[in-house]
Design a protein with these regions (language model features):
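Domain-level recognition of soluble alpha/beta enzyme cores
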Residues: 161-185
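Acidic, His/Gly-rich catalytic cores of divalent-metal-dependent hydrolytic chemistry
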Residues: 187-199
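General small-molecule cofactor/ligand-binding pocket signal
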Residues: 4, 72-74, 187
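Loop-to-helix element that buttresses phosphate recognition and phosphoryl-transfer chemistry
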Residues: 3, 7-61, 113-126
Length: 199
């Protein structure tokens, strides 16, 4: 079984350098173009199922990239929950909240603001990944989600301890994982090709 994981296109929060978290922020015009471009990149692949984060930016990405597929949503592959920081500019949070905020942000621990931490997010993403292992061995599945969720998928596949894995995913990049004989394999990480608009 193979999954193709697509990070959403550039969102308004990405553009503004704001905490998106679980906010329903849309894609920018650039993000919409990125989503259409990654659809061209994936055109030759047949998917048996498409699973999408229920947040708007991921849904918009899936609808543009894979318009001929119906999809199901799953909240477990949302971005990390940032609580009361949702929608706020990183610069404003830094100026108003100071060192404690910078420490929490570096640790990806937003529990002080009513959000979640890495361990809580890892549990829900790992549950999602474990559920995927029940799919048919020859299934090909597209997943549209967020950089944070992709990071936790990678941690699950690599069986590494949090937070010791440093990995980043560009907007509308594609990462590929295969599950075979009881084991996950990383095939590709953060592939963008030449189709993703940079400006």
């Amino acid at each position: 079984m193979r999954i193709y994981v697509i990070r959403h296109g550039q969102s308004e929060a990405n553009l503004r350098h704001a905490h998106a978290g679980w906010e329903q922020v849309p894609l920018t015009p650039k993000g919409l173009a990125q989503a259409a471009a990654v659809g061209e990149r994936l055109k030759g692949i047949r998917f048996d199922k498409v699973i999408v984060s229920d947040l708007l930016r991921a849904r918009q990405t899936a609808e543009l990239a894979l318009p001929s597929y119906a999809y199901q949503t799953d909240w477990r592959i949302r971005e990390i929950h940032v609580g009361s920081l949702m929608g706020r500019l990183v610069a404003d949070c830094t100026a108003e909240l100071g060192e404690p905020y910078l420490r929490h942000r570096a640790q990806r621990d937003f529990t002080a603001y009513g959000g979640e931490n890495l361990e809580q997010m890892q549990r829900r993403v790992s549950e999602f990944m474990d559920e995927l292992t029940k799919e048919p061995a020859d299934a090909q599945i597209a997943v549209a989600c967020h950089e944070g969720a992709m990071y936790h998928m990678l941690c699950h596949v690599m069986q590494c301890d949090l937070p010791y894995l440093a990995a980043f995913a560009d907007n509308c990049s594609v990462s590929v994982f295969t599950y075979r004989s009881g084991h996950w394999i990383l095939n590709k990480w953060n592939e963008t090709g030449r189709l993703i608009p940079e400006a």
